[in-house]
Amino acid sequence: MTYNIVALPGDGIGPEILNGSLSLLEIISNKYNFNYQIEHHEFGGASIDTFGEPLTEKTLNACKRADAILLGAIGGPKWTDPNNRPEQGLLKLRKSLNLFVNIRPTTVVKGASSLSPLKEERVEGTDLVIVRELTSGIYFGEPRHFNNHEALDSLTYTREEIERIVHVAFKLAASRRGKLTSVDKENVLASSKLWRKVVNEVSQLYPEVTVNHLLVDACSMHLITNPKQFDVIVCENLFGDILSDEASVIPGSLGLSPSASFSNDGPRLYEPIHGSAPDIAGKNVANPFGMILSLAMCLRESLNQPDAADELEQHIYSMIEHGQTTADLGGKLNTTDIFEILSQKLNH
């Protein structure tokens, strides 16, 4: 079998971190004996510059046919038209592929807790996953309007939309430490009242999982004061967007956090959670670990290569533990150095 992968380098540092990761994929495929083909497409701001829109039909159709999609990063101050922004291409891609699940792991690597802005004893051993609903909620709700005197956004969820994301979270928790924290604002929001009701109903199907409910403001506090208490966190779109960014700084850098977005069938999208960092684009100083860890998720989930994913992750964790990092993590290596060291380790 030959896996079909669509590569979307995007903007800013996206091309350099994605292209380097693809060089690692070539080494890994030879080592673990599997076949793939890459289809490159412009996306985001780069696509606006070339085609006048952030996501063309050609790119969208290629993504629909793919086994996996690897995305570098999109956006930047260059693209200011509110009706034609790079981010709108990503929203359209998520909606078109029905990517209703977003998975964001946060892991504090052994020996690297000193990198965190929080006290070492508070974060050491943190290993949590945020499961965010990605295609409903206030980002997609109708009606919405804006004028100089009034603006309206609508936060809507159906039972079916809540059930499908909650089932994903319960299954993930059952495969890990068996703890699920459901986050809502049930004390004031009607949508959260339905959310909590559905979570409690679905929990009856997963007796092996312990469920805890937290209001979103309390959860944001506990993520800082005691992140080690969490295993799997599930939440709606807006809450997940905010909490996952908060959690991502716990290990010490946005550059350490991968993510995956998927539906019940079809291709999965893998990307680091950081932005395009146009201020350092082309300077060979970008931290590529988030992109490489996203590749590891792709190897495990879409390419059926769990051993390869494990090896890649262990090499990364070892490098971080021994200070072989870029400047944002206190190291002295550049982007190329990271890829060269990983290439040597994989070829060993």
From Swiss-Prot:
GO cellular component: cytosol
Annotated residues for binding of NAD(+): 76-87, 275-287
Signal peptide range: none
One Pfam family from the record: Iso_dh
Keywords, comma-separated and alphabetical: Amino-acid biosynthesis, Branched-chain amino acid biosynthesis, Cytoplasm, Leucine biosynthesis, Magnesium, Manganese, Metal-binding, NAD, Oxidoreductase
PROSITE patterns: IDH_IMDH
GO biological process, one term: L-leucine biosynthetic process
Record site feature (Important for catalysis), residues: Y139, K185
Chain sites annotated for binding Mg(2+): D217, D241, D245
EC number(s) recorded for this UniProt protein: 1.1.1.85
Residues at which substrate binds: R94, R104, R132, D217
Pathway: Amino-acid biosynthesis; L-leucine biosynthesis; L-leucine from 3-methyl-2-oxobutanoate: step 3/4
Subcellular location: Cytoplasm
Cofactor(s) this protein requires: Mg(2+); Mn(2+)
Single annotated GO MF: 3-isopropylmalate dehydrogenase activity
UniProt catalytic activity: (2R,3S)-3-isopropylmalate + NAD(+) = 4-methyl-2-oxopentanoate + CO2 + NADH
Cofactor annotation remark: Binds 1 Mg(2+) or Mn(2+) ion per subunit.
The keyword Ubl conjugation is assigned to this record: no
Subunit structure and binding partners: Homodimer.
Family of the protein in this entry: Belongs to the isocitrate and isopropylmalate dehydrogenases family. LeuB type 1 subfamily.
PANTHER family found in the cross-reference section: 3-ISOPROPYLMALATE DEHYDROGENASE (PTHR42979:SF1)
Record function comment: Catalyzes the oxidation of 3-carboxy-2-hydroxy-4-methylpentanoate (3-isopropylmalate) to 3-carboxy-4-methyl-2-oxopentanoate. The product decarboxylates to 4-methyl-2 oxopentanoate.
HAMAP family tied to this protein: LeuB_type1 (MF_01033)
Protein name, UniProt field: 3-isopropylmalate dehydrogenase
